[in-house]
Amino acid sequence: MNLVTKSNNDYIEPIPHDNNINSIISDFNVKEEKVVVFDADSLPFICSYQPKNDEFGNPTEYYTKKNGGFDIAEGILNEKLLGIFNKIEEYFTIKTIYLCVKGNNNPRKQWLSSYKTHRPETPEIVNYLHNILIEKHNAFIAPIGEADDAIKTLVDTLGDNALICGIDKDLLTLSGYHYNYSKDFYQYIDEKTANYNFWTQVLIGDSTDFENLSPKIGKKYAEKVLDIDMTEEEYKEAVYNGFLKAWKGNVDLAKEKMELSYKLVKLWNFKELE
């Protein structure tokens, strides 16, 4: 049940959660086979998260190896994965699971030296859980690029046989069946929507990954100038004009920043990066 409620006098009635499964399944008597292609990079952060204070308001005793916290977090990770797969199996038969995680060869750091450097140092427990995914859950390490690029590579081969599982908005630049396990939400992203999502991100960037390459250009501007029915050339022109506006008519800077944003945002098939 969703925590959102509606009230009638003193009675509060829970509003059922809609996971949107009806938008992608018409016959629930038939279970399609799906290959689950999972962006697992967020799981170590989610499963090791602790609030500053416990339920009684006391300072939290954070997980450490010494106090057995790493084992607790590993148990949470195992339960999280099992819970996600159980939810998927309510509607699909899981043929294969690919848990994808990042490696150490990311060309985006060569294209932009400050890429993701503004993030705080990764906690030891997150690194521990990352290794657990590899050692105990047979996670696939991206040999080049990021976990998202591994997913792109797999989906290029699998097509609609894949169920893309993750919470990163970058994944919504891929067409296909999607499951956001955090929101418990299914959707199908068609080619037009995926392309619109991609060019929107190129235009406004991603502050969680890299510096703002198009100053003062935000979501509202993107919604105003981009349209889902645009051709590729129309997208390029509209996005270029946005960068030109951001860099006050400086053609060279606008072109340079747009090309860089394109490279950073794009999910690459491994063959394109070799």
Name these PLM-found stretches.
Residues N2-I24, I94, T117-E274:
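Extended two-metal-dependent nuclease catalytic cores across DNA- and RNA-processing enzymes
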Residues N2-N131:
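Domain-level signal for Mg2+-assisted phosphodiester chemistry and nucleotide/NA-binding surfaces
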